[in-house]
Structure formats: C-alpha cells, structure tokens
Amino acid sequence: MRITEEQELILGSLQCERLSSNIDNFRLVDDFYNGRNPSIVNTLQNEAYEDDANHRVAYYVVKNNSGEILFYFSLKCGLLYDEFLEGDRLLDMKAFYEHIFQLSKDPSLQGTDKDAVNAILEKARTKKGLKKLEVARALHLSLDSEELLKIFGENNKNVGITFAGVEIVHFCANEAHRDFWNQTGIQQKLGTVVFWQFIVPKILDLMEIVGCEYLFLFAADLSEDADLVNYYVDNLEFIDASEHSAATPMYDFACRFLCQETSTLQERRTSFFEHFNPDEEV
C-alpha cells in the first residue's frame, strides 16, 4: 500500500540541512551515538563541520521537528572505471596516448585517417574510453597485433572508460534518538526513508546540471552473513557490481563496492512510496 497522508506529514516534518549551514549543529552533534560505528560518529563530531564548510565532503543532518539529529550522511563526487589500470598497463596506455598525439600533428595525415586519430584523442580527453576495433582501423592494425595487446589485454574490447558518479561516504543513524522513529509506527527503517526521501532527490537535482551515471558506496561489512551489504541491496537497491571499479582510498580496501545506475532513480523512488507499506497489502 502506498504511503498514507499521516505518514507523509511525518516525513514532511523532518528537516535535512547541510551541517555547516547552521552553527547550532556544531553543538547538536555532541549527543550523536552509534555503538556499532564509533569511528563514523567521531568523524561527525570532530572533522565533518570543517570538511563541510570547506566543500571537501558535503555533510547533511536529518532532524525531527524538535531539532534533534536523527541521522547523518555525506556525499562527494567520484569516478568509476571499467578497469583500473596500473603498472605496465598504465605506462603502455600513457605511451599510446603520446604516440596518438604526435601522430595527430603529422602533416602527412589527411582525410578520414586524420579524423579517426582526432576522434581517438577526443575520447581519451573526455574519458569516454577506447574501442579496440576503432583503434585498429585508425592505425591500420590487426586486432591481434602486439600493439593492441599491450593496450587492451587479452579479452578487452574497450579500455579507459570512466563513469561520473556520486559516493555516499557516510550513512549513519543516531541511536540516542531511535525512539522517535520507533514511535512513528512506520515500518520502513529510518535509513531507507532518508535515502529515498532526501538523498535521491539531491542526486536527481545534481543530474540537471552535471553528468552523473552512478551512485556508489563502500560497505564496511566483513561479516559472514553480510547484513550491511544485504541491507543496501534489499532496501536501497544497490548491486554488487564487479564490472566497475573506483579510485579506492586506503581505508576502503576492506569494504565491498556497491553501486546503482542513476537513470532509473526517479521511477524507483516513485515505486518506493507507492509500496511504502508492503506488509499491509492483501
């Protein structure tokens, strides 16, 4: 069953604001508590305000109508890769781009050959990636040539493709005020509501002014039953996508990379609220 008017009023009473937009938040974060994620709480209480004010990471707090912080999350821009190149492959790619650049300045290169080389350069500049067949045609190489093998490897048809995205860096509930949410009678978890009510609209607004193909996160979940990963998959509709990788900070090496496409976010958000009370369906 879809969300009721009473439930809409409850969600409408919640406020989501940038952490540094209200000086009172500097004090209000002191009562934030989460026993399972003390390091995330420490970040909120000691680093987040300055990072938010300096636009390193955008921190948001969700409050009830009494001004108590119920939840916080943070967002920052990121980049996904079809394949993260390093070592010799990265050096080979750099040498290839230099070769193409020099070739583009060759006065003897004319017509369709020149157009093909310039097209490769433009795709490299805009990080749209290279297609093996296009490179082979432009440079008059066979698909199994040693030059292409260095760049594309054994089985890759594309290389160097990047995808614009936004990372959910922090996503944490304040257990000190959990009773507030429990007393609303809403069966959906607070984090699930925060995601669809507040985070998704921000991503949709962002998509109006910049390219953004993916929303992603690193789930710090090393448990055997993968409860956290399952929560992100079942409630927030992320997927465990091994075909993409990201520029991974050191502290995320022990985490699971999850992502979802943004192209259907609006439709899925609508569906979430249309089926807000699934247990009441006949």
Over which residues does each language-model region extend?
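Non-catalytic substrate-recognition and accessory regions of acyl/acetyltransferase enzymes
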Residues: 1-187, 194, 201-282
